[in-house]
Amino acid sequence: MPKLRSATTTHGRNMAGARALWRATGMTDQDFGKPIIAVVNSFTQFVPGHVHLKDLGQLVAREIEAAGGVAKEFNTIAVDDGIAMGHGGMLYSLPSRELIADSVEYMVNAHCADAMVCISNCDKITPGMLMAALRINIPVIFVSGGPMEAGKTKLSDQIIKLDLVDAMIQGADPKVSDAQSEQVERSACPTCGSCSGMFTANSMNCLTEALGLSQPGNGSLLATHSDREQLFKLAGQRIVTLAKRWYEQDDASALPRNIATKAAFENAMALDIAMGGSTNTVLHLLAAAQEAGVDFTMADIDRMSRKVPQLCKVAPSTQKYHMEDVHRAGGVVAILGQLEKAGLVHGDTRNVLGTSLVELLAEYDVSRQPSQEVVDFYRAGPAGIRTTKAFSQDCRWPELDLDRAEGCIRSLDNAYSLEGGLAVLAGNLALNGAIVKTAGVDEENLTFRGPARVFESQDTAVAGILDGTVKAGEVVVIRYEGPKGGPGMQEMLYPTTYLKSMGLGKACALITDGRFSGGTSGLSIGHVSPEAASGGTIGLVEDGDIINIDIPARSMVLEVADSVLAARRVAVEARGWKPLDRQRQVSFALRAYAMFATSADKGAVRDRSMLGE
């Protein structure tokens, strides 16, 4: 029978000093021997997805203590990718994932906590906490802050839904008036919560459901809705149950590595492909799998992308549907339900509720005669009131969206495509692969061939797009922006946004060893591996080289003779794999990150082989 980890600090005369300190935090004799559960919060006033989390840690803590545990809360950092976008701040976004994972490990292991509730929400916070949870392998439940309500405004006598990306596009489009740009800006982000489309934050929070580490509705129920309070309360209650299953009953199925198995990672990837999730999720799933000791690679993603259909199109791929609409259609469970009917997910995976996926679908899938309580839960909708407060409204849709032909979530018979919303491309330009969000690519752009226009940084690419250097028909190549070369693998949302604002959104392709925001759409291919700084072929491309992209064939080829590439490689190796004439201040912290960073095909995690592992 495993003993409580916290017993190391609470039992024995030699731990008198530790107990004295625990007493100073409010613990009593009756608490020594109870599981100490870390409430890992991520409240910050910098990020709308986290601004409402301040009191939610204590909400969870009260439930933990009522259920027989001892709750101890601490906070992690949280970077807002939207605010950090387009300047040097974006260099810090992806590295913050590793810092979050390490800080959770440091706190939990230093104080010998027995279990965790992870209160996450935005882009790098959920994956950072997920990496830590699988690394430490003690009972855990994830509960996110929830998505933002979609913005709404009236343009051309029509009410349209908005999000952050709309504000960026309008602001960059010289044809849009100042008044209209400001109107969209003021309407795009109306409430607290993670940005309202199927961007990285919401994609990851949905994937925690498929991994079995969060409760139904975690990824889709609005931050503002009163029903979300119950998710937090239940998380506090259920984590105590999980802790007791492990420490009192020796039930190893309560541990995250026995929940997030290879089959669960395949379920999560199937969900991601079906719902057209952010390409960043590929990075984060690969990284999390390594922490879990699961053999899950780009080859698995490529295999699955060829057989899992795309069942959803959500913003930024369309303005029609946002996360509030996904929830109305039954949320993650409804998508998994469609995949389960086709045999595309593993029904025997387990979850933090203690059930199998098949059992969870029987109770929560809105297409399988659920209880009225479940129906009402998925009817939770937006109020349209600007607020930064959680649980501040209780509006409900008049009815669910059960239209599986043309609704938000489609059946396999009505899928947008039989091959899903993400694809892995390979070829001499990306020997270890690259990722494209096919859900955001128009059919006419699934194949593209054109001359390269090469930039050594995101900054010069933006300037080249806005000053007219980039022409229709070209393939924009942005390199030395990978995990090592950036460093930090910046998101390229501004280049893709400005291509659209300049009328080039469908006339150009973009290839990079950097990554893309979940808000990106169009023919945008990222995660090119190996990256330029690691000797990848993308570092050998020159202006005018012809690049041939064929998404249906999963190929991306640089049409340059091998002998020419070999000669270029000799020249680049002589000067070093680094950008020419790029002026960028890189801090010591970022240089340290770059030293250990691997390319995107490995999840951009640190290279353990450098430590002799």
UniProtKB/Swiss-Prot annotation:
Q: Which GO terms describe its biological process?
A: isoleucine biosynthetic process; L-valine biosynthetic process
Write out the residues that bind Mg(2+). Answer: 81, 123-124, 491
Q: Which Gene Ontology molecular function entries are recorded, alphabetically?
A: 2 iron, 2 sulfur cluster binding; dihydroxy-acid dehydratase activity; magnesium ion binding
This enzyme's EC code(s): 4.2.1.9
User: Where along this sequence does the record place binding of [2Fe-2S] cluster?
Assistant: 122, 195
One cellular component term (GO) for this entry is: cytosol
Coiled-coil regions, chain positions: none
Q: How is the cofactor bound?
A: Binds 1 [2Fe-2S] cluster per subunit. This cluster acts as a Lewis acid cofactor.
Catalytic center residues:
517
Disulphide bridges in this chain? none
- Leader sequence segment: none
Q: Which UniProt keywords apply?
A: 2Fe-2S, Amino-acid biosynthesis, Branched-chain amino acid biosynthesis, Iron, Iron-sulfur, Lyase, Magnesium, Metal-binding
Quote the function comment for this protein.
Answer: Functions in the biosynthesis of branched-chain amino acids. Catalyzes the dehydration of (2R,3R)-2,3-dihydroxy-3-methylpentanoate (2,3-dihydroxy-3-methylvalerate) into 2-oxo-3-methylpentanoate (2-oxo-3-methylvalerate) and of (2R)-2,3-dihydroxy-3-methylbutanoate (2,3-dihydroxyisovalerate) into 2-oxo-3-methylbutanoate (2-oxoisovalerate), the penultimate precursor to L-isoleucine and L-valine, respectively.
Q: Which HAMAP family match?
A: IlvD
Assembly mode: Homodimer.
**Designated name of the protein:** Dihydroxy-acid dehydratase
**What organism does this protein naturally occur in?**
Aeromonas hydrophila subsp. hydrophila (strain ATCC 7966 / DSM 30187 / BCRC 13018 / CCUG 14551 / JCM 1027 / KCTC 2358 / NCIMB 9240 / NCTC 8049)
